[in-house]
Amino acid sequence: MRKASPTVITHNKIPHPFIVKISVLDSLIILLYFIGIIGLGLWISRRQAKGGREFFLAGGTMKWPFIGASLFATNISSQQFVGQAGLAFAVGIIAGGFQLVGAFCFILLSAFFIRTYMGLRLATSPEFFEKRYSGRCRVVVSFINLMMIILGNIAAALYAGALVLTHLLGWDQLPNAEFLYWIAIFLIGIAAGTYTLMGGLKAVIYCDFVQMVVLVLGGALLLYFGIMELGGIESVFVGNVDDAGRSMWSLLRPWEHAFGWLPMLTGGLILGVHGHCTDQDYIQRALSAGSLYHA
């Protein structure tokens, strides 16, 4: 059997157009996945006690495997599969440097920050500012965090998810593609919002566990088929350079580079501490633990 020759990849040059076509069965699987996730969330909502602590912190009953899986699924989502993958194609493997910094910041969260949060019996990160400073400070921090979540995290996740969904379903090739794109955003928002509002944090964490498995297995398959599409593992390493002739696999970039070692150690660490140690998405999951051990 003749072995395919490696494909030389250069910065911002795609080897060939890649068009995905899915069958009716594929579409049915996607639909069943949405229904299954919503159904799981609704089933959990019927089994848990009602109350503020149960809704926001899952009653403080979650165990570390589910918390860890939920944190992983929160950190690795459509934003990374679409956005960060595209960034890595443009600048190289160094785009994953933020995830390395994030892993270190998760250690900081579990070793230092979460002890303080649990000791003060907090439910949200802005509560810390009220206890430390004033209620006015809490309102300001809450407003800033809310705007960042709406305009940053949620907007990016919905955009990336809808981008993939419309492409998979072939909606982006239809005359009314723009309208169908908004439909995709609406469907994703409804699916996530339904089990979140009905089941609270416990439903979110259990659904995150399922989605973590899907993300890991799907990502592994995507990696395999992507490598095969390029002509084999050699194509990933041989001739994979940017416009300046630097290897796209290099983790060491000049300090003046946008992803150089200095920006990663300074700006990356600051962003990582904010995003992983004070962001409500992450600390709320950690605070759902039944004890400091599970947190």
For each feature predicted by the language model, list its residue ranges:
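Loop-to-helix junctions at membrane interfaces in multi-pass transport proteins
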Residues: 19-23, 57-66, 83-97, 130, ...
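Structural signature of transmembrane alpha-helix termini at the membrane-water interface
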Residues: 28, 35-46, 107-115, 154-158, ...
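Helix-loop-helix module between adjacent transmembrane segments
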Residues: 72-73, 94-197, 267-275
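Transmembrane helix boundary and interhelical loop/hinge segments in multi-pass membrane proteins
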Residues: 48-52, 121-125, 276-280
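Extracellular loop-to-transmembrane helix junctions
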Residues: 21-45, 58, 86-122, 126-127, ...
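Membrane-interface "cap" regions at the ends of multi-pass membrane proteins
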Residues: 18-81, 196-199, 215-218
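N-terminal amphipathic/basic-hydrophobic helices that include classical n-h-c signal peptides
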Residues: 1-19
